[in-house]
Curated annotation (Swiss-Prot):
Residues 42-89 bind DNA. The gene is DMRTC2. SMART domains: DM. It comes from Homo sapiens (Human). One of its GO terms (cellular component) is XY body. This is Doublesex- and mab-3-related transcription factor C2.
Length: 367
């Protein structure tokens, strides 16, 4: 009998018995199991052992007014989750507005980076340059490392700040700068400060022939002056209380000139008009000593009983000051004494006094 002719339900009970005993009975039986639903259920009902789907159950929940500790905990959790959702939505809205103002990226850019995308890599050919943190003055540190060779150290590329009157000094290197700083690109000289004195105390002149006892001379008696390089110390001051000449000629003033020894060219003084009152001075390295010796020389004239014209006991120095009368030519620098004054429009020649002041030069009083 062929296998195809055998009835479908025919089987040997002896052969099938041992096979049925060894086989798992659960695998043979088809038990209809209840399908597991993925739809959400009510949490309040679930706490009390009841399974109810949320669809259409919001207003029909039997435990909606329950205040047990489980239901209270669920209520607090819902409030916290609602606050978190509201905060996240507010932050996303602010971020979108900020990006739209700058126009840097689309509003979906934060979500794009949030999903774990990698940042753009360094382009090929620039792997050997590692940028370092910037210094306060804008200098950037670059560490060039050529392939196959060891670098000698980071190189500092810096640029000087904007032009300023003060000299620029680089900032000392920080802990990340093992190399040396480059020298500054330029150096500026320090600024020159000049002070202007508006009022000077008066020193009385001793009486001598040709001068009024009420004559006063303006001399600075406080503090050294500010030095200004490239000039010679000269002090000139008009004296008041002099007799006036003819009305047709302008009245001249007596003047005191102080000049140190060693000046290459003598300074000449021109007569001043009646309305002019000038106090011109420039400071030098020993201005204060010059003023003190000049004041001592003026005090020494009190005890002098010589003629109006006093010649120094020391041979004259070529560097002494050249004396000018209001209407006479200057005396030569290398001559002895003073040259005679030529004819003048004034009725009588004016007296003068010259006194030598050691190494500082000579002092001359004109009228």
């Amino acid at each position: 009998m062929e296998p195809s002719d055998m009835p479908a339900g025919y089987h040997c009970p002896l052969d099938s018995a041992p096979w049925d005993e060894t086989r798992d009975p659960q695998s043979t039986e088809l038990i209809p199991r209840r399908a597991i639903s993925r739809s959400p259920t009510c949490a309040r009902c679930r706490n009390h052992g009841v399974t109810a789907h949320l669809k259409g159950h919001k207003r029909l929940c039997l435990f909606q007014a329950c205040e047990c500790h489980k239901c209270v905990l669920i209520l607090e959790r819902r409030r916290v989750m609602a606050a978190q959702v509201a905060l996240r939505r507010q932050q996303e809205a602010q971020l979108k507005k900020h990006l739209m103002r700058r126009g840097e990226a689309s509003p979906k850019a934060p979500n794009h980076f949030r999903k774990g995308t990698t940042q753009p890599q360094v382009p090929s050919g620039k792997e050997n340059i590692a940028p370092q943190p910037q210094t306060p003055h804008g200098a950037v540190l670059l560490a060039p490392t050529p392939p196959g060779k060891n670098s000698c150290g980071p190189l500092l590329l810096s640029h000087p700040p904007e032009a300023s009157p003060l000299s620029w000094t680089p900032v000392p290197p920080g802990p990340w700068v093992p190399g040396h700083w480059l020298p500054p690109g330029f150096s500026m000289p320090p600024p020159v400060v000049c002070r202007l004195l508006y009022q000077e105390p008066a020193v009385s002149l001793p009486p001598f022939p040709g001068f009024d006892p009420g004559t006063s001379l303006q001399l600075p008696t406080h503090g050294p002056f500010t030095t200004c390089p490239g000039s010679h110390p000269v002090l000139t001051a008009p004296l008041s209380g002099e007799p006036q000449g003819p009305p047709s000629q302008p009245r001249t003033h007596s003047t005191l000139i102080l000049q140190p020894c060693g000046t290459p060219d003598p300074l000449q003084l021109q007569p001043q008009a009646s309305g002019a009152s000038c106090l011109a001075r420039t400071s030098g390295p020993s201005e204060w000593q010059l003023q003190q010796e000049a004041a001592e020389a003026l005090v020494g004239l009190k005890d002098s009983s010589q003629a109006p014209r006093v010649t120094p006991s020391v041979p004259p120095n070529p560097a002494w000051i050249s004396l000018l009368h209001p209407c006479g030519p200057p005396a030569p620098a290398g001559g002895r004494g003073f040259q005679p004054v030529g004819p003048c429009l004034r009725p009588s020649p004016a007296p003068s006094v010259a006194l030598h002041i050691g190494r500082l030069g000579s002092i001359s009083l004109l009228s």
